[in-house]
Amino acid sequence: MPAAILFSSLMMASCVGFADSAIGVEDNPTEPTKKPETASAKDPGKWWIDESYMDKSVKLSDDFFMYCIGTWWKNTTLDKENSILYRFYDVKPSFTDRVNSLTDDNYSKYKSRLKWADPNSEAAASAQKLYDDVLKKSGLEAATTPEDVMRAFGKMSAMGVSSCIRLDPFGYNGKVCLVVNVCNESYSESKRSSSDATQSDKKTSFRELFKKHPELMQHLVPVSGKSGTRSIPEKLSFIKYILEGMGIDPEACYTLEDWVTLTDQKKSSEINNKIAYMEEWQKIFTDKEKAVTLLKEMIENIYHLDYCLISQKTMEEVNDKLKNDTQAKGAELSLQKVEKTMEENYLPYLRSKLVAEQMVPAGLKDEYMNYCKEMIGVFGVRIKTNEWMSEGSKKNALDKLNAMVFNVAYPDHWIKEGLPDFSKSQSLLEDVYIMRTTRQNLLKAIVGKSRLKESFTALAMDNEAWLGLQNAFYDPLFNSMNILPYYILPPNYDPTQSLVINYQMFDTMGHEMTHGFDTSGSQFDKNGNYTPNGIWASEADKAEFDRRTELLVKCYDSYDVLPDEMPGVKADGKTTLGENIADLGGTEIAYQAFLNRLEVDGYTGDNLKLMKQRFFLSLGEEWRSKYGEDHVNYVAFGKGNPHGADVHSLSKERVNGVVANMNSWYEAFDIKDGALYRAPKDRIKIW
């Protein structure tokens, strides 16, 4: 129900009265006539949660997670292929399968050309001509200075050739800006071991790096030159000329003032490789005697990357060279690798549009946005009535909440220049060039634009954030809450299902909003800029926030992850702190919005009690899953995991850790004791 309708309904409800009954002398004065009671509202939606999954032999105040899904846990068997099984794991087709099946005439034309062309075909001839023309038109051969060589390289990139750099959008100063990244594309697959492949293939985008280490944003400088007292490092000056050739304003592109900062903090070996690669280019660029010759050789090697896409013959030529290359370690060209590279780097925006058009019903975006407004209102009240923050910090928090961008389902508009058109293409090589150029066109269209208008576009073109993912997330650089289609489609949201289930699943909205105020998000202001003091107006407020978050760490540290299989092994409350703050805050927000709705709709008595209990039972269902020791070690503790430990708690703690700190859970089930019981003074409230 839209927020405006809710408010109107509440106002009407508050004005309803009852006519007084006249009491005569003959009436029994000891039994006054009662006012007639309005019958309680009833849930019109379907309560589909299977209560046979519950294990009522478990005392709910000892382990609410197992109380909710314990029988299902006992009856579900893991196998060698699955260290964890989530709810709906057996539903076919899965959401991912449905997304992967989406296509249209344009996209299918590209997919049909994913093959090595016959050397004698028109496709091969067209590709060869295109390949040759790019080099001629770029001016590379005629360039006589290092600067002109790099500008020619930029022109080649604008025509579709891969570059040594990649531009990724991110939020900065309230606008969409671009950060310079390293681009090392490859169509070959190595024969190295799977464990080596996993480690090497791990990518670190600067957008993610800034989210994890926001202090690095203090070292950002425009590629064009100086910003205040900071200036672009000399070792990266060559980048400016590539951007000029590409037709992109260096003023809108950023890099780090001191890349050594990354090395010192040992963010990852992959980042260190980026630094080494950049330094190699700059070293050659400043070689007065050999720069032009050596730079041309490096560029032609990158240009030659796409040679294999011309035909079967050129693919075989490249493969023969790979076999004799000791550094290639037996790598071979793979169409699967071509497809993966294109889909990850250049197709997320097009595929996001397919998801929006073919999976999201008309009107659903607006319907869900109305619920977002309810959540904003609830969170705003919680901030205003917060007992431990000063008025200054409250104002900062409210300003940030009110400035937050709510990206739901899909962008409000699609930028035509950023959508590859394969209708006139004749070859796979041309398709690849089209994808690269349209990505650059999309970046040109959004760079410098307000985060309010184009943050969703910037994210929808990112393989880590495109619309086909089963995800919702908060982006501190844009100060945006992003709910992708998966979370507004059944079974997560369905207008026909129980009101309880829908509102409980709105904890996703509350969760992502709360991330803007967790240990990391609170360091960013309303425009998405990192500030040393964050949203805190006083040191006392920050100290109190830290004290409360430390209590939450200790709370989660006290939980046994798998009491039977791993006795004595506790959860990691420190690693998961940010997500635990968001889980607790998000559930509190969703529950309060739910109570507001119940009041408006007129729930009373036993029906009201039932609805409150079902909210928490639905929380247990949301995190229904079965996992074992292997999953706990790999995911929760990061043993053997190249990505390290997960920042999310395990499912059991995502339920038990939340309810144990919510007064409303104790009230709903009349809880007075139990292993999860925490005295009122010990229940942690942050947001």
Q: Over which residues does each language-model region extend?
A:
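Short, solvent-exposed loop/turn elements at domain surfaces
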Residues: W72-T76, S188-E189, P491
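Active-site-surrounding "flap" and adjacent substrate/cofactor-binding loops of secreted or lumenal enzymes
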Residues: K42-D43, K59-D62, Y67-Y131
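Zinc-dependent metallohydrolase catalytic domains
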Residues: T145-D148, S157, N370-F506, H515-W687
